[in-house]
UniProtKB/Swiss-Prot annotation:
Cellular component terms per the entry's GO annotation: cytosol
Species, as recorded: Halalkalibacterium halodurans (strain ATCC BAA-125 / DSM 18197 / FERM 7344 / JCM 9153 / C-125) (Bacillus halodurans)
PROSITE patterns on file: TRP_SYNTHASE_ALPHA (PS00167)
Encoding gene (name): trpA
Subunit structure: Tetramer of two alpha and two beta chains.
Protein name per the record: Tryptophan synthase alpha chain
EC nos: 4.2.1.20
Pathway stated in the Swiss-Prot or TrEMBL entry: Amino-acid biosynthesis; L-tryptophan biosynthesis; L-tryptophan from chorismate: step 5/5
């Protein structure tokens, strides 16, 4: 059983935070990962910063800009994972990358590199499901999970994607880019139920989740939540503290407290 399979096996209320590699700087990204595991994260989603992030709203776009100031590349982002492991990170790491940098690097080469660096899965939001055969084969060869992203589209397409999902199915709570939302789309529950009827792996939901009430409401039909913009926004607000070695501990504590309050039942 892989590290990811072990993490999700029979577990409810999975918490999957998203952070951007290199934000606010590479060293603090490692500290953030460790802090998030301490706060209760089951899986870490690590975003590769990119200059043209189609699925990301302004909060995560700003995080990419902060990371790119440190010349964070796909290779450098991947290399953070073994450093996290060396400092005690035990949870699975899913790498979130867009298709252009992936193709420039080479799909098979990227997967091999990710496996060498102890990554557990890959998520490519702008790669159509039908075009993922090369990536799927490479992931299978190197024992990585290719995470399926499912949007509220036709039932036939949902069934096709959910049935072939690995690790977990990542459901998009609403169409559009990532970002904080005051209210979730009321149709999300029906959508999650549809996905669950076809999936043999846990069903998690992301995009727009930022409050404990939303986490609690989604627990009825989802096996877990992905929280990105709310955490990344806080990282941006605490940028000065996190970049100051004397204030770093206080900044990390504030993030841990926010996450603990978000997922406490």
């Amino acid at each position: 059983m892989s590290r990811l399979e072990a993490a999700v096996n029979g577990k409810k209320n999975l918490f999957i935070p998203f952070i951007t590699a290199g934000d606010p700087n590479p060293e603090v990204t490692i500290e953030l990962a460790l802090t998030l595991e301490e706060a209760g994260a089951d899986i870490l989603e690590l975003g590769i910063p990119y200059s043209d992030p189609l699925a990301d709203g302004p909060v995560i776009q700003a995080a990419s800009k902060r990371a790119l100031k440190h010349e964070m590349t796909l290779e450098k982002a991947l290399s953070l994972v073994p450093k996290m492991r060396a400092q005690g990170l035990t949870i699975p790491v899913i790498v979130f990358t867009y298709v252009n940098p992936l193709l420039q690097y080479g799909e098979e080469q990227f997967v091999k590199r990710a496996a060498d660096y102890q990554v557990d899965g890959i998520l490519v939001p702008d790669m159509p499901f039908e075009e993922g055969e090369v990536l799927q084969a490479a992931c299978q060869e190197h024992n990585l999970s290719l995470i399926s992203l499912v949007a509220p589209t036709s039932n036939k397409r949902i069934e096709k994607i959910a049935a072939r999902a690995q690790g977990f199915v990542y459901c998009v709570s609403s169409l559009g880019v990532t970002g904080l939302r005051d209210e979730l789309d009321p149709r999300v529950h029906e959508f999650l139920q549809t996905v669950k009827t076809h999936a043999s792996v846990p069903v998690v939901v992301g995009f727009g989740i930022s409050r404990r009430e939303q986490v609690e409401a989604l627990a009825e039909n989802a096996d877990g939540v992905v929280v990105g913009s709310a955490i990344v926004k806080l990282v941006g607000e605490l940028e000065d503290e996190l970049n100051d070695p004397e204030k770093l501990e206080d900044g990390l504590f504030k993030i841990k407290r926010f996450v603990s309050e978000l997922i406490s039942s």
